[in-house]
Amino acid sequence: GSEVTEKAGFTADATITSGLGLHDVTVAEHALALILAAARRLDTAVRAVDEQRWAKELSVNQPLNNATSFTIVRGSRIVIWGFGGIGQRLAGYLKALGVEVIGVARSAGERGGFPVITADDLPAALETADVLVNILPASPETAGVVNAELLAHLPAKAWLVNVGRGATVDAQALTAALRAGTLAGAALGATAVG
């Protein structure tokens, strides 16, 4: 991301270019894969195969809607925080699967046919979300913004999918929410590095 370039100490006359849009497709597809894996509990299924057992917990009494558990993508409500190129591409994929998508960006309105809210309205949107997808870049303003206060707005059945920078997620708050059962799961494409 640009944060690495900014910290590199280049002189003011150095030319810096952008790869804007270069990874939109691959990151959006990765986010989609994580969402589908969360809904279908592929982690549990793979573990069962490794243990050479039938994953009874995945085949008996699964809800046919998302009222108590996020198990079906169609009809779910997914909030995408970071609604630039990657977020809008992901929104298109999700719309094709029958998902209600809400984008979160610096300014509210509509982008690509999707409703977009600001971070000020994010807590209210999370109250009924099945998934929060974080695609935020790392910056002083975004450091640790996915914190305990924000996670508390998600229902206990919800998942966090992070394909944004790891530094945007408060790892201790996420771990605490998962251990307390106030968040159903997390699919992390990125984590903070030491």
Which positions does each model-derived feature cover?
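Rossmann-like adenosine-cofactor binding region
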Residues: 107-194
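Phosphate-binding beta-alpha-beta segment of Rossmann-like dinucleotide-binding domains, i.e.
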Residues: 14, 19-77
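Residues at the starts of beta-strands that form the adenosine-phosphate
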Residues: 77, 91, 99-100
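An N-terminal-biased, well-structured beta-alpha scaffold segment characteristic
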Residues: 1-17, 147
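Conserved N-terminal Rossmann-fold NAD(P)-binding element of oxidoreductases
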Residues: 78-82
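Hydrophobic/small residue at the entry helix of a nucleotide-binding pocket
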Residues: 86
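Gly/Ala-rich phosphate-binding loop of Rossmann-like dinucleotide-binding domains
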Residues: 91, 95, 178-179
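Short, polar loop motifs at secondary-structure junctions
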Residues: 1-5, 103-110
